[in-house]
Amino acid sequence: MPLNFRDRFNVPVLKNGEEVAYLVGNSLGLMPHKTRDYVNQEMDAWSQLGVKGHFVSGKEDLGQDVHQGPWYSCDEPLHGLVGPILGASEDEVAIMNTLTSNIHSLFSAFYKPTAKRSKILFEAKAFPSDTYAMEAQARLHNLDPSEALIKLAPKDGLHTLSDDDIIKVIEEQGDEIAVVFFSGIQFYTGQLFDIPRITAAAKAKGCVVGWDLAHAAGNVPLKLHDWNVDFAVFCTYKYMNSGPGGIGGLFVHDKYADDQRPRLAGWWGNNAETRFKMLDEFDPIRGARGYKQSNPSVLCVLALRASLELFKEAGGIEKLRERSIELTNRLLKGLLASPHYIAPENIEIFGNSGKAWFTIITPQAEHQRGAQLSLLFGPDGTMKKVFDYLDDHGVLGDERNPDVIRLAPAPLYNNERDVDLAIKLINDSINLINGSA
């Protein structure tokens, strides 16, 4: 069932005024109308209150509330909004920093290599920033990344990792693995990993388990607490529509809520009651918020709040997932029916005809993907031609060189027209390339 929230967002338009089919919420979500209102309100508060905005609403000086609340606590309402999206309590989440910095923050607290258990297991084709972070963490502990990192790659001829293969490595090498750290949804292929199963296997071998949920948070329902995940990081500018470079977040399981483990501490993780007393001794807030470091950007926080309120109004992540499945299934069905589609197992047979073609490298089963489908085009040079044609005719997707276009219907603002237009234009563009238009 349509959720009818499209008119709550700013949808880009073509020169003729027609709305584009924006299928790239997996890269940057659209801006809710409310975001501009919230941000402008805080700009007004800054201009009228100055530094007092940290502690007052404006009523004391101006006779009326002029913003969403004191900046000192502006992020507090977000924990209750994002918790249900992650399957976490308010105390298990913190809105802070950005994704890679949060990876480093949590690895500093949870990656404790020993002589017997020092390795990190993750994807060979992880998002580059994750790879850089893993290599940096190894070096920070005076370890050789080539020895400390187990980079697990798909089998020859495949684009995705098997959950079974991941678990096999955990069972065989788990006694040497300190941290298992995968992406919930793989950024390139769109594969959704079996988070609870992989987590359980790793925990059974004594490993710490973390997840990069950049492409999973706000996309698929998660149950991080129930799955016994140790920690996780996420960004909010994709499916949670917080804006370019939007604030990130992290999850730390409640079983660590009262532990005083060393961390990259900062004053915003200190007990709020004594924070401004400027005491020398660090007294961490209970739970994930004890990992905060600096006061967050008010404008980024309010941009995220505007979108999270729409998540709640729409009925939550489970309701959005139902709509997401409808839209992505429609996209998948239309693409599979294309005369230019070649099944992955048939590419060697039919992919060398000289004609343009595409396949889908995202798993087709609903439980193995989120909103995104990744289309691989051939021969070389086809993807760019198709991408430019889509862009010129009102479909925005995401190109990943050398040969992939990612399309991701977002349930809050995409509709059947967007999906059907993408299917039509992909077929039209390949017809033109092949000279059969």
Swiss-Prot record:
One of its GO terms (molecular function) is pyridoxal phosphate binding. Pyridoxal 5'-phosphate binds at L99, T100, F127, P128, S129, D130, S183, D212, H215, Y237, W267, N295. Its cofactor is pyridoxal 5'-phosphate. It is an enzyme of class 3 (hydrolase). Homodimer. PANTHER family: KYNURENINASE. This is Kynureninase. It comes from Yarrowia lipolytica (strain CLIB 122 / E 150). The gene is BNA5.
